[in-house]
Each structure stands twice: as structure tokens, then as C-alpha cells.
Design a protein with these regions (language model features):
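A conserved acidic beta->alpha catalytic loop
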Residues: 43-51, 98-99
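Short beta-strand/loop segment that forms part of the nucleotide-sugar
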Residues: 33-45, 67-68
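Cell-envelope/extracellular polymer assembly enzymes that use nucleotide-activated donors
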Residues: 3-5, 38
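Short helix-capping segments at alpha-helix termini
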Residues: 28-34, 58-63
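Acceptor/aglycone-binding surface of glycosyltransferases and processive sugar-polymer synthases
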Residues: 69-71, 75-85, 90-93, 99-158
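Short, well-formed alpha-helical segments that are part of the catalytic scaffolds
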Residues: 13-30
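Conserved donor nucleotide-binding strand/loop of the catalytic core
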Residues: 40, 51-80, 84-85
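Donor nucleotide-sugar binding loop of glycosyltransferases
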Residues: 13-16, 46, 101
Length: 158
């Protein structure tokens, strides 16, 4: 059985780790029951109780795992360390605050099963302020023109 690893880096996400855990496990169990899975939280030395909540989630569900950093390694290094620890055939990285819609997990897995090695989600619309969305679009276009490397506009980075 193929295994999906969902990696969720977090820092001070006490309000979100419980809800995102429930949402991800529900999607995986209902829509992708043919796969084994692990949900791995990598905590970046949170100070708001996030760690205790994650420990409770791990105690309740053996498929939920925790990596608890001894210090804050930053938003880029921490997910990398998480990638070194996961055991799945497919990796989906998400942020804890629902910026990445959990409803897209089945679509990502479907595209991966077609043979794609990397599947990336991009924003085509946003609930954020229109001015901020426009400014972000201008930023992406500027970076795209200045860069020698092909850029993906509105790539969330997760």
C-alpha cells in the first residue's frame, strides 16, 4: 500500500493544529482510503501550547507524528528537516493555518499518480484585500522579469 506523508511545519499555531489535523485526516480517510498515511507536525519551538496539543494528537492517533525542534530553525530549514524524517511515497507540505486548502489533497495525489514528480498549487483567486492581491501580482511579475530562473506566479511556497 502506498503511503502519503502530510508535513505541516508550525510555530505558535495552538489555534490551528487541532482543526488542521482533523481536516487532513478526514480527507485522507474518506477520499483516499486506499492509501496509508502519516501526518507529521514539525514544531519550531512554539511558546503558545502548540507542542502540548500536538502531543495530545499523537497520543490519540498513531498516524500523527511530531518533530519538536529544540529551537526555532526558521520557516525554510524546519520543513527540510521534516522531509528527512518522513516515510511516505508522496509528500504534501501544508501550512497549519489553512492557507493551503485541504480539499486539494486528493487532486494532488491524483496528479502524482499520473506520474508527475512534483505537483504545485497556485492561487488563481484570493479572499485577501484586492489591493494586496494586485500588489502581490505586480511583485510576481517583476521577479519573473528579473529572474534567470523560471518562476511560478502565485506559488504559495508550501
Amino acid at each position: 500500500m502506498k503511503k502519503i506523508s502530510v508535513l505541516i511545519p508550525c510555530y505558535n499555531e495552538a489555534e490551528n493544529v487541532g482543526p488542521i489535523s482533523r481536516a487532513v485526516t478526514e480527507i485522507l480517510e474518506k477520499e483516499l482510503p486506499q492509501y496509508d498515511y502519516e501526518l507529521v507536525f514539525i514544531d519550531n519551538d512554539s511558546t503558545d501550547g502548540t507542542r502540548d496539543i500536538i502531543r495530545g494528537l499523537c497520543a490519540d492517533n498513531p498516524r500523527i507524528k511530531a518533530i519538536l525542534n529544540a529551537r526555532n530553525f526558521g520557516q525554510f530549514n524546519s520543513p527540510y528537516y521534516g522531509m528527512l524524517q518522513i516515510t511516505g511515497d508522496c509528500v504534501i507540505e501544508m501550512v497549519a493555518d489553512f492557507q493551503d486548502p485541504v480539499e486539494l489533497i486528493p487532486q494532488y495525489v491524483h496528479e502524482w499518480e499520473k506520474g508527475y514528480k512534483i505537483v504545485i498549487g497556485i492561487k488563481t483567486s484570493s479572499k485577501e484585500n484586492r489591493l494586496m492581491y494586485w500588489l502581490r501580482s505586480c511583485y510576481y511579475k517583476t521577479i519573473k522579469k528579473l529572474s534567470d530562473v523560471e518562476q511560478i506566479e502565485h506559488f504559495t511556497g508550501s
